[in-house]
Structure formats: structure tokens, C-alpha cells
Amino acid sequence: MRNVQIALTKGRLEKHVIPLFEQIGMDCSEMMDKGRKLTFKSNNSNVSFILVKAVDVATYVEHGVADIGIVGKDILMEYEKDVYEMIDLQVGCCKLCIASIPAYDPKKYRKKRIATKYPSITSRYFCDKGEDVEIIKIEGSVEIAPLLGLVDAIVDIVETGKTLQENGLIVLEEMYPISARMIVNKAALKMKKDEIFNIINKIECIVSKK
């Protein structure tokens, strides 16, 4: 069997996804005590893993460095990479939301300023609504931007809402549901069809039982 390389998102999503691969019989023990390592081999299969930042997973898959990737739907919507989206894994579930301070009135007729890590998604969303907004991209914690008067509102991922609450913000509108997706390199799906679909079919069986 040909080797298959899988790119995983480091951090929170990684913890949700590794158990799925273990359930289909892959040995992921190397990743349990990984230290600073970013590449791993499954000892009982033809699969190897790499751990990268969320924004890089789809890039590695698009360019064929990884055959399969696991990444949030938010990243796929923002960067629109040329890959196949195969499965909604139904883990890492959260929502992309518009949030601001309680006193903010979104119905005020003026151009709004929105801070976000997702300028492309945000631009398309407000364009579809016919609203003219100024978008300011912020890479760090966007929650502080409305408090300092930089923007009127933010667009960000909300899981429990605790971070918003701790910073005095509320959800104004839920935009999109977000969850982890399995993506595949287009060329790899042809060259390693049997190996990749073997993984996909097993994962689908696990997900369908949830």
C-alpha cells in the first residue's frame, strides 16, 4: 500500500480528531507524548501525520505535501483552496458570529467598522446583505477592538461564549455553523484512490454513528 500523509490542525481540533483515527485502528501513540515534534508515523499502518497551524493545513493539502487534511470549515470558507471537501467530521463544532458591546445598535444607518480574522467571509456576508462595511483584519484577540472604540463589532468563532462574556460582549447574530472537515488533494485522490477511500469510508462509519 502507498503511504498517505495527513495534515492535522494543532491544538483544540487535534484533540478532537486523534480519537477518530484511533477508533479506525490507527496507532496514534506517538502524538500522545509528542513534545515539540510535528511529524509522526502510525506504527501499524501506512499513514503518517504532520501537525501544522489551521491556516496552513489546506495549503499543504492543495500543494500535495499532504494527501488528506483536517481543518475547520471557517478556514475553507476564508481561503477557498483548490481541494476536495469530503466529510463533515462533526467535531470541533462552533459558530461564526457577529458580536459587540450590549449598547451597540446594528440598525444605525451608517457605515460600520468590523474587526475580524476572516475578512473574506465577512466581506461576502455583508455584501450579500447589501450592507457597506469597513473591515479591519486583526490577527490576535479581536474581542478587545470594540471595547477600545476601534470598531463597532467583531466577527469571530464562538464556541461557549465565555470569552465574549468575560470581555463584556454579546452575540448579535449567528452567521455560519463551523465544524472540522476532511479535505483531500485532488491529484492524490486519483493516485492513491484505494488508500484514501479506505480511510474515508472507515471515518464515515464512525461519524455516522454519532
Swiss-Prot record:
Pfam families with a match to the protein in the record: HisG
Entry GO CC: cytoplasm
Listed GO biological process terms: L-histidine biosynthetic process
Keyword ATP-binding included in the entry's annotation: yes
The EC number(s) this enzyme carries: 2.4.2.17
Subunit structure: Heteromultimer composed of HisG and HisZ subunits.
Name of this protein: ATP phosphoribosyltransferase
